[in-house]
Amino acid sequence: DNPRSRDERPLPKVFLRTLLFATSKRGCVVESMHVALSRNETQQNFNIWVYGDERLVRGSGLFVGETGIAVNHHFLTPQDGSSFRFTEGRYRMDVFAQLLGDRDRTLLFSQTLEISREIAAQLAEPDYGLYFDWGPDSSRYLPHVDKRPPLPNAAFLELLNLARRSQSRSRARVKR
């Protein structure tokens, strides 16, 4: 996730791509979703829900039909949860949905994930992210860390844009 300002670290984020489906012919509407992440006695809710593939939409309701919908889900911590950091340990991730018309939330699934000391040290550095991919032979999610490439400098991008405009004008003059 990008920081909200240049001086801030990015907020912790949980990203999932999942297929949701309804067992009824009429389908259902997901009013909201959130992730509850717990380690030992610490629990953090990731209650800011954003979803979509091409265009992200802040959790505003999602129709789920009988054939299902596969979509990317991003869960962020609220501003008051910004002190949360991923550290070494065993985590339980619970994904909940609030369905239209239901009084109680529904637990969609729960997964245990492990973060080693080495991975936790890497995550303390800026621009690193942790990914879990399914290992079919081990029947568990396996972690790996990746560093996000740096964002281009805004001034450099503006110069590049000016150079492209200049080249376009030169080509237009030559074609006359």
What are these regions (language model features)?
Residues F46-E88, F96-R105:
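Extended, solvent-exposed segments with strong compositional bias
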Residues E31-W49, D94-A97:
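Extended low-complexity, serine/threonine- and proline-enriched intrinsically disordered segments
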Residues N40-T42, E54-G65, I115-D127:
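Short, surface-exposed linear segments at secondary-structure transitions and domain or protein termini
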Residues Q79-Y131:
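Terminal connector regions
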Residues Q111-R176:
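Acidic, serine/threonine- and proline-rich intrinsically disordered appendage/tail regions
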Residues L20-S24, L37-E41, T77, A97-G101, ...:
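Beta-strand elements of well-folded, non-transmembrane domains
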Residues R4-V35, G65-T77, R140, D146-L157:
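Contiguous beta-strand segments within globular domains
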